[in-house]
Amino acid sequence: MLIRYAKDAAARALRRLLAPMRQDIGELRKELRSMSSQLEGLEGRLGALDEKATRADRVSTQLRLTLRLNDKHRDTLARLDAMVADGSVLGHVRHAIANTRLDLDPYPHMVVNDLFPPAFYKILRDAIPPQPFFMDRDPIKQNLKTPMDLGPALSVRTLDYLDDVIAREAIRPAVMEKFHEPLQSLYDTLFGPEFRARADQMPQAPSGGRLMLRRPGYFLAPHRDPKRAMLTCLLYLAGARDDEAYGTQIFRVADDREATFTHTYYPEEHGSRCELVKTVPYRPNSMLVFLNSTGAHGAAIPPDAPATLERFTYQFYIGPGAETLNDLVKELPPERQAKWTSPKASGHAAM
């Protein structure tokens, strides 16, 4: 009994001894948690400052390049103004499209060669801004949306002319006429034969214009563009010495079907097999136009391609405006409406 009493006394003494230590440890833990929270906040603020500094450096570089190129391109801008004034570029584009054959295999598409007058194409090539003006998140896949917020005068004015005038006043009406019959079949598929005439009356306009820069390692799986796009136009801005390899891949799709959602559609994700039919060459002053109906298209530049290889293209869609399209979709039978409203996310990165 004496031994037990001694043990209990020792335990009580130990607890009294440890109590302040436990309190100290608890306080220490609180301080550590507070310090950890402060460090996280500090890291966040430092990260934000780092990002702002990077953006500031980027804008500074863009401003320096803009000033230098504005001086260099003074005479080129004068030549551009003369071409815009006489309207010769628009007439040339319309004629080139009208005289190009429409290919129906594996789906309606056409490749227009010598799309622009040579003198304008040279200006268009000169107007491609340096890399710092492109989005810098992914060096393999960089985009520059139009219109530009900041850039050399030649780049801003040429790309604005391409997007606002050439695409709208020359390319759009010419390709709409060329693809008139295939578009009627597409309207039947998307809206039903009873809504074909209504769909054919919808005003169509270019949208989503962007200058794209692609490098070795780039891969885009076979896909169809968002359903709202009736036609896709890809202008190849190759240099005279560029290899024609690694253009746009055209696929035939076995067991093809209409997408049941409006987003980009990847047939292989839905059990369909894609067969490569051909690769449209990356050729100077040419344009690929295709109906966004069946089949698929993609692109690939192998990682072991020359490190200096660059692929510049300008892409835009032609389709009805969102409000006009939504008004028509609201009138469709429920089973057709569902194919326009059901969202579908994909693991693939956008083009």
Label for each model-derived stretch:
Residues 119, 128-136, 178-190, 194, ...:
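A generic secondary-structure signal for well-formed alpha-helical elements
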Residues 111-113, 210, 232, 289, ...:
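Short beta-strand segments
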